[in-house]
Amino acid sequence: MKNVLIIYTGGTIGMTRTENGYAPQSGQFRRAMEAIPDLYAEQMPRWDMLEMDPLLDSSNMTVHEWNKIAQLVADHYDAYDGFVVLHGTDTMAYTASALSFMLEGLAKPVILTGSQIPMCEIRSDGRDNLITSLLIAGAEEVHEVCLYFGGKLLRGNRATKFSADGLIAFLSPNYPSLADAGITIRYNESA
């Protein structure tokens, strides 16, 4: 069975309702994940989660956090078969691109994902993005930094955000998707 490390940086996927709107709360997202039975299904990889401190809105993500994420991957590289980075959507494409150059020569997947709607909401896109990212990170088809969102696996340094309110928020206009997730996950061998 494959082992995947989830690095939770903050962002919409893990936010909860507060008096002042949505906000990330330390420890809350782990409890929410523990209540999703599909994350423990037989076909899922085993996973552990590290929560960054502080949790950030991705508009506050800087080079310092990119270095921290890259160092976490390096520090845990031998213990895991793949990595999922949960990240806010505002700067996810920038982080994916930066990490793709910082982590060159990978033999394992590093998949960035998040959501447009928090997991605490009934219509959240986060559940599918998380589950599919874990499946891809636990597979052997991808060996690079990628961004998975809305059914598409995109090369990390070719993704761009094009919608702030649609559930298909990222595109790769100048490079084909690496995989498409529908009923099955279809990897694009020619990409």
Residue ranges: model-predicted function:
Residues 1-74:
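ATP/NTP phosphate-donor binding region
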Residues 2, 7-11, 17, 32-41, ...:
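Accessory alpha-helical/coil subdomains and C-terminal extensions
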Residues 10-11, 84, 133, 151:
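Buried hydrophobic positions in well-ordered alpha/beta secondary-structure cores of metabolic enzymes
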Residues 11-13, 88-93, 152-154:
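Gly/Ser/Thr-rich loops at beta-strand to alpha-helix junctions
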Residues 15-16, 91-96, 126-130:
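Short glycine/serine/threonine-rich phosphate/pyrophosphate-binding segments
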Residues 78-82:
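Short acidic/histidine-rich motifs immediately flanking catalytic phosphotransfer sites
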Residues 86-108:
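Short Gly/Thr/Asp-enriched flexible loops that form oxyanion-binding sites at enzyme active sites
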Residues 112-182:
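Internal gly/pro-rich beta-alpha loop/helix module
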